[in-house]
Amino acid sequence: MNSQAWIQLAVFLALLMLLAWPLGRWLAAVAEGHLPQGLAPFCRVETALYRAAGIDAAVGMGWKAYALALLAFNALGALAVYALQRLQGGLPLNPQGLPGVGADSSLNTAVSFVSNTNWQGYAGETTMSYLTQMLALGVQNFLSAATGIAVAFALIRGFAARSSSAIGNFWVDVTRITVYVLLPLSLVFAVFLVSQGVIQNVQPYQDVSTLEGAASTPQTLAMGPVASQEAIKMIGTNGGGFFNANSAHPYENPTPLSNFAQMLAIFLIPAGLVFAFGRLVGDVRQGGALLAAMTVMFVLAVVTVTSLEQRGHPQLAALGVDPVASALQAGGNMEGKEARFGIAASALFAAITTAASCGAVNAMHDSFMPLGGAVPLLLIQLGEVVFGGVGSGLYGMLVFAILAVFIAGLMIGRTPEYLGKKIEPYEMKMTAVVILVTPLLALLGTAVALTAPTGPAGMGNPGPHGYTEILYALSSAANNNGSAFAGLSANTPFYNLLLAVAMWFGRFGVIVPVLAIAGSLAAKKRLPVTAGTLPTHGPLFVVLLIGAVLLVGLLNYVPALALGPVVEHLMQAAAR
């Protein structure tokens, strides 16, 4: 890494912590329902909504009722998104006259946006009408993010509660998160994006002449309400682009400043939730330990991917091409990257979007060096707990914290405890389910895709790189990331259905056992700290937590990674 990359990383982390701390205080207030008096008019509107829907906001839910409400809410959301896509040809706000989307693609997209994955097998500018973008995809960008944060709130309440049968009210949580967190942040961020040149309109596509004049063919420029969707796309760690090029498109991400702000937006709520966690459990040091573990793993990932991309292709270096960055060139591997961002900003964006469950891209991960592309892939496969998605990153890391204290308990022969709650067989069974669901979906799905006749047909490249494209797709879907090695032609009935299954169970097959853990912990008494209690706020626990995350990730995925990016790297090195 050069000095520019180090400075960029340092400024990014400093601004992130500066912004996440006050947001954490606000998130804690929203979780507890302690809203300031100045919001009384909004609170009255909120109360009216509950009354109209027949919801008693004062009644808490057990984990089973919470889970059923969540599943029903998201299932209805998926049906609505599916129907809007199928019917868009006869609906308004469709100036290009785009027809209804096919059944398999509609199903894939509905599951994708409801599960906060935002995998896109289609090109937005040639497939989706403005109404579908706004009413189907845009709405789910808010609701899927609110669902993830609600689950995180429920798990935090499980740790903080004392002999309680309730973990909150799902309908209240989703409403408050949407109204008091996601909407205000998105509104402010959308205005900023418009100031940077992100478009926001409902005009028909524009035909323009290029600089060549009459000798050239007119070019069609896609229009649309981009800024409003771009804001929640980042803040909600959704990642689904309005355009096919996602955040590499100048209408989505026009300037280096907008690029930096989008990176901050991705991590803002995940980092804020860690601070909120410390406040809600009554010990800010607990949140600090989780934050330290996340930051260490994130910095290691950024340094690795940036260094590998800056080094460039070894065969080009052998031909005398200068790979060193200078005032006149970016150096390194610029394939698939935007000149206005360069290697450092592209590598940092790649690490951020895959550490979080965002999946937005400002460069093509498929064009990264073999080991450079392995870094974002591994970040996805670790379960996206390095800050992670909104809500999902925190509850995923808390599951690993439970695993870490269990391992420590085995080493010292003591019943494990975390935040005063005994970790017993039921919690460990649910923890095992959470940890094993996504690797099972990713690896089994990859095996199915490789052995089915229609699976390898979608590979854009032969050999280990084509295999990595499939592994990346299934890992991304199962872990609800949504980014891709885009050389894979995935908009086929086979991949649309396979990836939809991975996305649905990768999301809700994790959420349900997490809520079960929350319900079990909430019912327990909170034990006092004794001399035999493992401190979970110091550097020793941070190291133990990092070890648990890396150990599980490596044991699950290293054999699969060895067949893809590692083999490709060795083949590339041997060809010098």
Curated annotation (Swiss-Prot):
The chain crosses the membrane at residues 4-24, 65-85, 136-156, 179-199, 257-277, 288-308, 341-361, 371-391, 393-413, 430-450, 497-517, 540-560. It comes from the Bacteria. Keywords: Cell inner membrane, Cell membrane, Ion transport, Membrane, Potassium, Potassium transport, Transmembrane, Transmembrane helix, Transport. GO terms for molecular function: P-type potassium transmembrane transporter activity; potassium ion binding. It is a multi-pass membrane protein. It is found in: Cell inner membrane. One of its GO terms (cellular component) is plasma membrane. The keyword Ion transport applies. The keyword Zinc does not apply. InterPro entries: KdpA (IPR004623). Belongs to the KdpA family. Part of the high-affinity ATP-driven potassium transport (or Kdp) system, which catalyzes the hydrolysis of ATP coupled with the electrogenic transport of potassium into the cytoplasm. This subunit binds the periplasmic potassium ions and delivers the ions to the membrane domain of KdpB through an intramembrane tunnel. The system is composed of three essential subunits: KdpA, KdpB and KdpC. This is Potassium-transporting ATPase potassium-binding subunit. The lineage of its organism: Bacteria, Pseudomonadati, Pseudomonadota, Betaproteobacteria, Burkholderiales.
